[in-house]
Amino acid sequence: MQIRRGCEADTERLVALAGQIFETEQEIPRALTPLPPENRPQWWCVEEDGALLGGVALYWEDNAWHMGRFVISPELRGRHVGTALLETALTDIFAQDIREVTMEARDTTVHILKKFGAETTGAPFSFYRGTVTPMRLTREAFWNSHTGGQI
C-alpha cells in the first residue's frame, strides 16, 4: 500500500471513489464531488495494486484553503490508513506556503484532526446524512502537536 500525492491522471478516479462512497453512505449527490480547476485542487491518495482506495483534497474556496473530499474505502477502515493519509497530506500542505486549512469533518475525522492540533470553530451542523463540525488547523499547531515544533 502506498500513500502519495495524487497526479492529474488520478483525479477522475478519486472523484468517482469519493462520489460513490459519499452518495452511498451519506446521501451526498455525486454532482457535488468534483472540484473545478479554479479551486486549484490538490489530491493525495491511497493506492494498492493500482487501485485507488482513499483520497483527500486541498482546494481554494471562499478566500481560504479548505481540506475535504476525505474518503477511505470500507475495507481499509479501522486500520489507521486514514490517519496516515491525513498525516501525509498535511505534512505536504504545510511544507508549501500554506499557513492554515479549514474543513468540515465527520466525527471520526474530528478525532484524528484534533490529534494533529486542529480546533473546532463552531458547533456541528447537519449535512446530508449526519453532521459535520467546522474546524481549522494552522501550520504552527500541526508542527507543534505532530513534530514537537520542529520543521
Map each language-model feature to its residues.
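A short beta-loop-alpha structural element at the N-terminal edge
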Residues: 2-14
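Active-site rim helix/loop that mediates acceptor-substrate recognition in acyltransferases
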Residues: 19-48, 52-53, 57
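Short hydrophobic/aromatic beta-strand element in the GNAT-like acyltransferase core
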Residues: 41-45, 55, 69, 102, ...
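Conserved beta-strand in the GNAT
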Residues: 51-59, 66-71
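Conserved acetyl-CoA-binding loop-helix of GNAT-fold acetyltransferases
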Residues: 72, 78-91
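Conserved GNAT acetyl-CoA-binding A-motif
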Residues: 93-106
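Conserved catalytic-core motifs of GNAT/GCN5-like acyltransferases
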Residues: 102-104, 119-137
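Conserved active-site tyrosine of GNAT-family acetyltransferases
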Residues: 113-114, 118
